[in-house]
């Protein structure tokens, strides 16, 4: 059992140097009220904190580590690349090699991509590119979907049934006072009626609609039938660009991502996380007619000293090649199914008001009777009981993503022994969470 109290000392030291003791806010674990572990090392499906406590990891660097920690092939690629230089400030062979591997896997012709260092950079660039291509400046996104911390994708004007009929007036008023600034409209996820009404009113002025094909940052939320199809159809009708954010889902459920799972293709697709194999890599990809609007061929600006870093590119290629191995995704699916099915059965048999939602190797526990369809329903979950459940599991060495609004992940290297142990821990934690409230 982890010695949780000792970690307070190390976390207090981290707080001397970093705001909240972290360099990304969710790592502070505030939603579940635990002292965040400080990691010393990690291998396969285990990380070890600074006091030697072992944790079975179901966060996996927020979905990046589909191959687990310290995979030998990825480590070898990193070490070999670093021995030739860590950064060039020029196009490298490793960039071309990873791009070639990607296009072969994705089976795309007449497409181009641009590598960047983070999902935020990729989505920010995708939106800027869409505005440059369409000469429009309205961005549509959906409440609860996270696309990085660029202002244009964090803030905006919310649209719901209360102000739906006044969208055109809201837009006109905004641009009258701030004619040069983009406007972001935030709509409810999974609401086709509201989305289509907004597009009917102002669709010709919309630069892009950005969406997650499966929501991850309010927990795993599946799209309702017809929702994604409506987004793509309305974008085509009004000549807006669709941007599919696959920073998390890309290469998680299949080598071709949601293009093959849902049979949908957006104008621009954004990748990250698994693409880097644990290193900082992201990319945006689109037909060359769109991508060639970027400098130096076009007028849309994007730049980055570490974009296409040769060491990160080598790690990314190794990660993608591992994903391409025979039966990789079917094995991962079977591993996840075998792990979660007994937990689902206990939830049903005991009548717990808990929805265990999964898609591929991603899963979330929602403490409510039915799976939520949007952020409003997520916020109705029993957060207090989720916290009890989480802290009990954590005390026994199981590390889920530390918020009810975050997904957890299975990797290809989770051992059956650790999964069996975690099954028992999660079932016991569920039972105790309902005994203690």
From Swiss-Prot:
Transmembrane residue ranges: none
Example of a GO cellular component annotation carried by this entry: cytoplasm
GO biological process per UniProt: protoporphyrinogen IX biosynthetic process
Gene3D superfamilies in the record: Aspartate Aminotransferase, domain 1, Type I PLP-dependent aspartate aminotransferase-like (Major domain)
Keywords linked to the UniProt accession: Cytoplasm, Isomerase, Porphyrin biosynthesis, Pyridoxal phosphate
Record PTM N6-(pyridoxal phosphate)lysine, positions in chain: 273
Cofactor names: pyridoxal 5'-phosphate
Coarse class of the protein's main subcellular location: cytoplasm
EC number: 5.4.3.8
Subunit structure: Homodimer.
Family, per entry: Belongs to the class-III pyridoxal-phosphate-dependent aminotransferase family. HemL subfamily.
NCBIfam families membership: PRK00062.1, PRK00615.1
Name assigned to this protein: Glutamate-1-semialdehyde 2,1-aminomutase
Organism this protein belongs to: Chlamydia felis (strain Fe/C-56) (Chlamydophila felis)
Name of the gene encoding the protein in the UniProt record: hemL
């Amino acid at each position: 059992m982890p010695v949780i109290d000792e970690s307070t000392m190390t976390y207090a030291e981290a707080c001397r140097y970093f705001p909240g003791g972290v360099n990304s806010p969710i790592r502070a674990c505030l939603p579940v009220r635990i002292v965040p572990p400080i990691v010393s090392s990690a291998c396969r499906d285990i990380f070890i904190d600074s006091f030697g406590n072992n944790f079975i990891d179901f966060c996996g660097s927020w979905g990046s580590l589909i191959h687990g920690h310290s995979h030998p092939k990825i480590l070898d690629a990193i070490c070999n690349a670093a021995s030739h230089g860590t950064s060039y400030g020029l196009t490298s062979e490793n960039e071309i090699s990873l791009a070639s591997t990607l296009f072969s896997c994705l089976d795309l012709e007449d497409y181009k991509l641009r590598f960047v260092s983070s999902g935020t950079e990729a989505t920010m660039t995708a939106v800027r590119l869409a505005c440059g291509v369409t000469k429009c400046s309205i961005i549509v996104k959906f409440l609860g979907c996270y696309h990085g911390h660029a202002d244009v994708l964090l803030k905006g004007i919310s649209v719901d049934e209360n102000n739906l009929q006044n969208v055109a007036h809201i837009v006109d008023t905004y641009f009258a006072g701030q004619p040069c600034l983009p406007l972001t409209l935030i709509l409810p996820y999974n609401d086709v009626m509201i989305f289509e009404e907004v597009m009917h009113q102002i669709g010709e002025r919309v630069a892009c609609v950005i969406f997650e094909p499966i929501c991850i940052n309010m927990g795993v939320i599946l799209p309702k039938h017809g929702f994604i199809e409506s987004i793509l159809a309305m974008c085509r009708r009004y000549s807006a660009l669709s941007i599919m954010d696959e920073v998390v889902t890309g290469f998680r459920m299949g080598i071709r991502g949601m293009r093959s799972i849902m049979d949908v293709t957006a104008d621009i697709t954004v990748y990250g996380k698994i693409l880097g194999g644990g290193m900082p890599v992201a990319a945006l990809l689109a037909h060359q007619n769109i991508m060639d609007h970027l400098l130096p061929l076009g007028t849309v600006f994007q730049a980055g000293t570490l974009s296409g870093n040769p060491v990160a590119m080598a790690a990314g290629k190794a990660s993608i090649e591992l994903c391409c191995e025979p039966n990789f995704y079917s094995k991962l699916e079977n591993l996840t199914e075998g792990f979660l099915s007994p937990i689902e059965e206990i939830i049903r048999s005991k009548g717990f008001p808990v929805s265990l939602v999964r898609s591929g190797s991603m899963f979330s526990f929602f403490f409510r009777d039915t799976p939520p369809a949007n952020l409003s329903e997520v916020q109705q979950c029993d957060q207090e009981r989720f916290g009890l459940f989480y802290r009990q599991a954590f005390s026994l060495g199981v590390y889920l993503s530390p918020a009810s609004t975050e997904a957890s992940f299975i990797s290809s290297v989770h051992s059956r022994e650790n999964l069996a142990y975690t099954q028992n821990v999660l079932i016991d934690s569920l039972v105790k969470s309902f005994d203690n409230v």
